[in-house]
């Protein structure tokens, strides 16, 4: 069984037992959270799509870790003006372990 969930402004296809990295969630490591923004639920033969959400569906997940993704380098330059600017950014994430998908 799999589900399409929405968290942090993005959509993820998840199945029970998977680990996924999502945008940072304000929760402690080891805490169990319930994601109720489920857009679709399927089990291979049948697919239930919500308008926009599937009513009564939820996904239980456990917070495994918090961290930062790889650095993205930003480089700005104006030709012939001797202007150069370098900047970097590391986006924070939360790693979740998907437990159960309830319909």
UniProtKB/Swiss-Prot annotation:
Cystine residue pairs: none
Family annotation (Pfam families): Ribosomal_L21p
Top-level taxonomic group: Bacteria
Keywords of this entry: Ribonucleoprotein, Ribosomal protein, RNA-binding, rRNA-binding
InterPro entries reported in the protein's UniProt record: bL21-like, bL21-like_sf, Ribosomal_bL21, Ribosomal_bL21_CS
MF terms in GO: rRNA binding; structural constituent of ribosome
PROSITE patterns: RIBOSOMAL_L21
Coiled-coil regions listed in the entry: none
NCBIfam families named among the record's database cross-references: L21
Function: This protein binds to 23S rRNA in the presence of protein L20.
Name of protein: Large ribosomal subunit protein bL21
Taxonomic lineage from the root: Bacteria, Pseudomonadati, Pseudomonadota, Betaproteobacteria, Burkholderiales
Gene: rplU
């Amino acid at each position: 069984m799999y589900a399409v969930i929405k968290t942090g402004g993005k959509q993820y296809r998840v199945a029970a037992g998977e680990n996924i990295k999502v945008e940072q969630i304000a929760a402690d490591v080891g805490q169990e959270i319930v994601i109720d923004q489920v857009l679709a639920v399927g089990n291979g033969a049948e697919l239930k799509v919500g308008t926009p959400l599937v009513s009564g569906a939820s996904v239980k997940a456990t917070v495994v870790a918090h961290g930062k993704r790889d650095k993205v380098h930003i480089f700005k330059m104006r030709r012939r003006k001797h202007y150069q600017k370098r900047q970097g950014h590391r986006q924070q994430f939360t790693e979740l372990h998907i437990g159960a998908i309830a319909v």
